[in-house]
């Protein structure tokens, strides 16, 4: 099992050289951000399509946020698919050379996303979870697209470096009141809540349905009554 990701720069043909340079920087950033969760090095194709292969429990939004909140952030189209992957006989093949059913699904999904002008598709293999993620994804894309350069910087410090408002103010050498205004304009708090919600929904897709049903049944079963306690007392 693995988490396959495909991403391409929206409108990359208008600046293919710039898009390629930016993707190269993003690949290095994501390799570092995911660390041991990578099952293969990130890479990108000549068509400016980024590909990655991560552990199934990895957080897809890490890639989305790193791309969207960078200083030269470009609009991306993302597809994430959790599913089966083939073994790597070499042990060091990059994601662009890996195969498996999850890659096939991801290829079809990103083509559909281009046709439907979708920007973020996350597929866990559980229809109920995937449907809810499809409802939430456009809201995240809209919020990220609406940020100015300054707001992206503030959001990046808060969401990727986990800094408090006071720490962001210190980092940027501005008054805390100024950062408070920036937080409000960037809608950092609502953005954090939305990201947390999507992460929660996504993580629910990793729970085995059979195991979840068993745990739910166990949790709702009444506790057995110990002999002598039926009337609220204990026999001596």
Predicted regions and their residues:
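Regulatory and interdomain segments flanking nucleotide-handling catalytic cores
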Residues: 1-216, 220-236
């Amino acid at each position: 099992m693995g988490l396959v990701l495909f991403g391409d720069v929206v409108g990359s043909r208008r600046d293919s050289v710039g898009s390629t340079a930016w993707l190269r920087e993003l690949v290095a950033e994501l390799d570092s951000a995911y660390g041991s969760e990578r099952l293969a090095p990130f890479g990108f194709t000549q068509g400016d399509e980024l590909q990655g292969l991560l552990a199934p429990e990895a957080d897809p939004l890490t890639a989305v946020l790193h791309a969207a909140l960078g200083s030269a952030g470009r609009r991306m189209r993302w597809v994430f698919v959790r599913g089966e992957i083939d073994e790597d006989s070499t042990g060091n093949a990059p994601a662009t050379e890996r195969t498996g059913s999850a890659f096939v699904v991801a290829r079809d999904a990103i083509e559909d996303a281009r046709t439907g002008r979708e920007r973020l598709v996350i597929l866990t293999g559980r229809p109920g979870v995937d449907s809810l993620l499809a409802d939430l994804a456009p809201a995240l894309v809209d919020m990220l697209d609406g940020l100015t350069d300054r707001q992206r910087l503030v959001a990046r410090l808060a969401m990727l470096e986990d800094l408090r408002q006071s720490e962001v103010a210190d980092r940027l050498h501005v008054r805390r009141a100024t950062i408070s205004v920036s937080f409000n304009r960037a809608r950092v708090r609502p953005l954090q809540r939305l990201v947390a919600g999507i992460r929660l929904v996504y993580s629910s897709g990793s729970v085995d349905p059979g195991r979840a049903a068993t745990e739910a049944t166990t949790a709702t079963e009444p506790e057995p009554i110990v002999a002598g306690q039926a009337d609220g007392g204990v026999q001596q």
